[in-house]
Design a protein with these regions (language model features):
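Signal-transmission linkers at sensory-effector interfaces
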Residues: 1-25, 36, 56-58, 121, ...
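Alpha-helix N-cap/helix-start motif at coil-to-helix transitions, marked by capping-box chemistry
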Residues: 1-4, 75, 109-110, 141
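Amphipathic alpha-helical coiled-coil segments that mediate homodimerization
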Residues: 9-17, 22-41, 45, 76-80, ...
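GAF sensory/regulatory domain recognition
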Residues: 31-35, 44-68
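Acidic/proline- and glycine-rich, intrinsically disordered low-complexity segments
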Residues: 54, 64-90
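Helix-to-coil/beta transition segments that act as allosteric "coupling" elements at the rims
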Residues: 86-131, 137
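Allosteric cytosolic regulatory segments
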Residues: 141-148
Length: 155
């Protein structure tokens, strides 16, 4: 990945965080720049809705039927996105648990730490065809941090 691509991700992500009025618009802008600059076919941001359910608050690259299917799959506590909320550790380049789409998935927790306490606010989930290099992973982690701040800001 070029340093120009990295700069574009961080600049546009920071601008989306600072200037979007709604959380969905801010997050979709962040996802859009990821899809444009990295080899990401689709991306979603999922947050707990206050109960035991998860909701998709932003997506890019997914048709409505795929979004509906993912929303249904999130009811399964064994789904990788649901597992990332419980065990907030990034996973990269893992095969999908359900057929269809790109060959690999990556899941990054959206966390913030306040007063020494870390809170999981959601998950950045990506579908892609090729493994992610170390620099791409670092940029995705930075984007997940920006997304976490956006979610926290609008809670």
């Amino acid at each position: 990945m070029s340093s120009e691509a990295a700069r574009e991700i961080l600049v546009r992500g920071a601008r989306a965080l600072a200037h979007a009025d709604a959380v969905g618009a801010s997050l979709e802008s962040m996802l859009g720049v990821l899809a444009e600059t990295l080899d990401i076919e689709s991306a979603v941001i999922v947050v707990p809705d206050g109960s035991d359910r998860m909701v998709i608050v932003a997506s890019v690259g997914l048709a409505d039927p795929a979004i509906a299917g993912l929303a249904e799959a999130l009811h399964d506590p064994g789904h990788p996105i649901a597992k990332t909320v419980v065990d907030p550790v990034p996973s990269f380049d893992v095969p999908p648990t359900r057929p269809g789409g790109p060959a690999l998935r990556s899941h990054l927790p959206l966390t913030v730490t306040r007063d020494g306490t870390t809170t999981v606010l959601g998950v950045l989930a990506l579908a892609h065809h090729r493994p992610l290099d170390a620099e791409s992973r670092r940029l995705l982690e930075a984007t997940a941090d920006l997304a976490a701040v956006a979610v926290e800001r609008h809670r």
